[in-house]
């Protein structure tokens, strides 16, 4: 009789835990997000955070950190597609296993690095605002930053709002459309 009672108590526990925590493929987190602010124990002297973008491609479980390689703030390798997983409110980057809590508020994403207790002052929070670029502006499958392009300066304004030195460079960064000339600030 005791075994039957224990079995009746254990079975609901087993079934209540199964299948409730699914991998999040949040469709609302899609496309261009522009960095607005960073909160950390670090110093940014009049830094323009909006030069940095994060692009989400949930159908492919990919994201791309875009910005100036020499002066950018990135959560992944700059301008290269990276696999990710969102599970139970945590964004995990496959390439380096860094984890961030992710909070989605209407047109805003807040990423907070999950602190490593063995490292002092590694707390950092990124606040991104939804951008206006078309979802098909960047194709992560077309990114090939190892493409050899000429150094000719023939600037183009990419659909992502960045000025690229020439059309070849824009295409190698996965930009699907651009206009001749520099982007206006």
Model-identified regions with their sequence ranges:
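Short linear motifs in intrinsically disordered
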Residues: 80-85, 99-101, 140-149
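C-terminal motif of bacterial Sec signal peptides marking the signal peptidase cleavage site
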Residues: 15-16
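Sec-dependent N-terminal signal peptides
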Residues: 6-8
């Amino acid at each position: 009789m005791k075994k039957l009672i224990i079995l009746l108590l254990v079975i609901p526990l087993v079934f209540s835990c199964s299948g409730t925590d699914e991998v999040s493929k949040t469709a609302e987190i899609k496309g261009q997000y522009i960095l607005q602010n960073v909160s950390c124990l670090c110093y940014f002297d009049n830094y323009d955070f909006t030069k940095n973008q994060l692009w989400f491609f949930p159908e492919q479980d990919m994201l791309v950190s875009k910005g100036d390689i020499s002066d950018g703030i990135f959560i992944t390798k700059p301008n290269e597609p990276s696999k990710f997983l969102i599970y139970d409110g945590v964004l995990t980057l496959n390439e380096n296993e860094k984890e961030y809590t992710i909070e989605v508020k209407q047109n805003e994403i807040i990423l907070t690095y999950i602190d490593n207790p063995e490292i002092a002052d590694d707390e950092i929070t990124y606040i991104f605002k939804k951008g206006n670029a078309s979802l098909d502006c960047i194709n992560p499958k077309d990114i090939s930053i190892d493409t050899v392009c000429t150094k000719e300066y023939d600037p183009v304004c990419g659909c992502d709002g960045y000025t690229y030195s020439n059309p070849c460079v824009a295409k190698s960064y996965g930009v699907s459309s651009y206009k001749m000339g520099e982007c206006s600030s």
